[in-house]
Amino acid sequence: MVINEAFQHSVFAACFCIMICAVSISLIPSKKDDLAERKSICFILGEDTIEQEYYSLATEFFQRDFAAKTDKLIKHVRSIEELLHFLNQHPEDEPWARIELVVHGNVWSGLSVNILDGGERAYPKELLKAVIKKQLPLLKSNVIDTNTIINVWGCGIGTNPIMNIALEKCFTDELGIKVRLNSSKKFVVFKRQVNNGQVKLVQASYWPYFFKRGYRPSESLIVKSLQEQFPDAPIDFKSAVLHKDKSLTIQESFHIPVSWTVIYDTKKDRPTVRKQDEKINWIKSQKQLMKNIEEFGIPFDRYQWTVNKIKHTDDHGNTVPAIKAIGMSTVYCVLKEDRSV
């Protein structure tokens, strides 16, 4: 009898629990529903120059594309520091679901955006140093979580391991929570479709050719060099360079800058850098600069160099004697569309 009563009570309790659980499940939104209700934001981190449409087309894409459009679109931010400050100062009720970053970039010289307001470009190593030295603000705990996705649309950025580490650290909050970071490994093109006029995000494989800025070689030499450098590439370089098939291939070119400044105690300590051979010898005597160039993977003779004595203003506002070198290499890329997003 005791056993039977216990059994009856247990059956009743079990049924009651099942009913409560069923009610609870119906009242508590699923994790998927929570994520669907969270907001998204896009940062356009630059402006177009003459004959460029990268940022304007990206703006249209993230405003109008059914799948990719974001709840907010911000166009005035121009540094990683300002970006992090903005996210901290404009929190939503829930962490962001998706953060889109649109920026010019490349595997060689990183992102075309300043690290600090008014500071230097976000080269991979320099960005990582800034994070390690705690020069950038930490994201607050309510800004992101482990479900937040950050897409970085900068050409080939995802193939640079140092840049990936730096970005991951930038978007780790004060509690150590990390986002789901996606950095594009392909070339990124925002392209208007001929048939319907809509803008699509296209990812493309790319094959680079480097030359001194202002010294573009003939198309036949570019074709020959690409064929020798990439013999197994699934593309007809001759047709691509001559632009015979515009529907399948795209051409892009941009500059890779290198800047180096050395400060001297007095003007007399500065060596003479008037002649071209003196300039080249001075550049080659700078071991760290030469190491940086080697890490870029761009041959030294593919840079156009200017070397001058200058007056440099240091961190304390003092004017000091210095020598500054600026190297510019142009990279010409042949692109082949892989897929549209």
Language model regions located:
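A conserved mid-domain beta-alpha-beta active-site/ligand-binding segment of alpha/beta enzyme cores
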Residues: 199-294, 301
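Extended low-complexity, polyampholyte segments enriched in Ser/Thr/Pro and acidic residues
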Residues: 316-334
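Catalytic cores of nucleophile-dependent amide-cleaving enzymes
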Residues: 98-102, 106-193
